[in-house]
Amino acid sequence: MVTFLLKKSYRLKDLQEIDFKDLWGDHGIFTTMWIFGNPPKILFFKNHLSNLLKSLKKYKINKRFIKNNILQILNKNLSKKKNYNHLLRIAINKNTISISLRKRLIPKLNFNLKLVNLRRERPQFKNLKYKKILSHLSKMNNTKSDIGVVFNKKLFETGTSNLLFISNDKIFTPKKDYYEGITYKFFKSKV
């Protein structure tokens, strides 16, 4: 079970704090970022924010000042004094912005994948239609296991990461029907 350091939700129209909603299953978008250090830094923050905003437009959740609202909520909730090694999740639907912070788990070397026949809805977006994946992940020790998302006998990604296969100095990945993560895009740009 995941332990959260922070869970907050805000009404999008006026940024009033409301009871926390994780928004899983809703029509919306999320991003998960590694926040580390003191003072805190977020790995690839500009890329995550840009991708989140582009995806929100595609999902027709295009509110004025949404970027500033996100930054305001983060500044209000993240401590400049805390030493972080956490995962920060921002989730947005048409009415709500939710943020949560959980400890970053370090994967063990002897890692395994449980193959699960599952098709993600609109996999090119990091959307909130993630309940089936979460139901599998919640039954596992995520430092040792993840799921492999398989559809039509093809392996596309894991429940938490992209897949990269390397052979003879060439990188192989699925061609389509998977979410291209920010870290994946970074590595792809370096090859």
Model-identified regions with their sequence ranges:
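Helix-start/capping segments and mature chain N-termini
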Residues: 1-76, 93-191
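Short secondary-structure junctions
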Residues: 78-86, 142
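Hydrophobic/aromatic-rich structural module bridging two neighboring secondary-structure elements via a short loop
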Residues: 84-94
